Amino acid sequence: MNYQILARKWRPQSFKKIIGQKYIVKAISNGFSLGKIHHAWLLSGTRGVGKTTIARLIAKSLNCEIGITSLPCRKCTICQEIEKGICLDFIEIDAASRTKVEEIREILDNIYYTPSKSRFKVYLIDEVHMLSRHSFNALLKTLEEPPQHIKFILATTDVEKIPKTIRSRCLHFKLNILSEEDIFNFLKHILKKGGNNFDEEALKIISDYANGSMRDALNLLEHAMHLSKNNINLKNTTEMLGIPNKKHAFLLTKFLLEQDSKKMMCLLNKISKIGLEWQNILIEMMRFLHHIAMLKSYPKIWNQIFIKNNENEIKKIAENNSKYNIQLCYKILLKGRKELFFSPNHKMGVEMILLQAITEIKR
């Protein structure tokens, strides 16, 4: 059975299908339409935002048999070979595993050979920031005056580690992290196409926990599909991610602001038996604190878009607590989350963070 993971199955095969990178797609497409073809592109951004996908589309656009175009045909031999990853003139190099200058020089020595059957020989150097200083120096000489038949695409998740001399010789595009809305809509589209049942709340959680990465979102979605036999529901999704249910997160936040440490510790002990990611408890509490703070500051506006669960109780909490205390708790939880991994165990860390917040609340 030829099963394809979602990230490969749904990889965009045209610039029009790229999500969340409108400006970059427009700039690259216009460059091809105007015949202004740069010799080197630098694509930077976090994981799963489309760097490799855009690089492959650039390679197809440069080498499509109908001509240089922003709309490659996908039917010619070159387009199909690039999509399958078997094109001899599109060379993908993982810089993380080829950091030595000797290896880079060996690659660069071959660039003077003409393409086997394409218009251009395209080199994609992924994670280029991993190259050594000597490797960058070797690459710099080629980037200054490359042969006419050579194009470079550099991809990185850490652009600051790339020397300025390299960056200045490339057309640099900084890819944005994807919005939760874009990720949610795409996941929804995939599930509808596949005829899967799903809970929109579960998709919203997956979209949020993907942290702007479409690949992470698709991997989480695939995990959820396997767990629930293609029926994505809220219960399985929260258990999969180790997220406390909203009721527990709300009650912990309520007890915190009421300075009721006894009830808070009893609930934490109850939660510990379920088996959750402890940092997720802090994250969900911070969400409630954010909602309470916004309701406190903008009651008329925020009330219209506020979550419906526990609405009356949340309004009461907002009325009974000062902006200072709400902000203070948020700040302590935020700092505590960063330092949680230094505690002897995460449960102990969360308990101490919440006790500190209770101690510092002013009445």
Swiss-Prot record:
Keyword Lyase recorded: no
* Enzyme Commission number(s): 2.7.7.7
Q: Which Gene3D superfamilies match?
A: 1.10.8.60, 1.20.272.10, P-loop containing nucleotide triphosphate hydrolases
Which positions form S-S bridges?
A: none
Could you name the domain of life of the organism this protein comes from?
Answer: Bacteria
**What keywords is this UniProt entry annotated with?**
ATP-binding, DNA replication, DNA-directed DNA polymerase, Metal-binding, Nucleotide-binding, Nucleotidyltransferase, Transferase, Zinc
Q: Record keywords: Metal-binding included? A: yes
Q: Where does Zn(2+) bind?
A: C64, C73, C76, C79
Classification via Pfam families:
DNA_pol3_delta2 (PF13177), DNA_pol3_gamma3 (PF12169), DNAX_ATPase_lid (PF22608)
Q: Name one GO cellular component term.
A: DNA polymerase III complex
Q: Which residues bind ATP?
A: G45, T46, R47, G48, V49, G50, K51, T52
Q: What does this protein do?
A: DNA polymerase III is a complex, multichain enzyme responsible for most of the replicative synthesis in bacteria. This DNA polymerase also exhibits 3' to 5' exonuclease activity.
* Listed name of the protein: DNA polymerase III subunit gamma
Q: Which organism is it from?
A: Buchnera aphidicola subsp. Schizaphis graminum (strain Sg)
Upper classification of the organism: Bacteria, Pseudomonadati, Pseudomonadota, Gammaproteobacteria, Enterobacterales
**Encoding gene (name):** dnaX
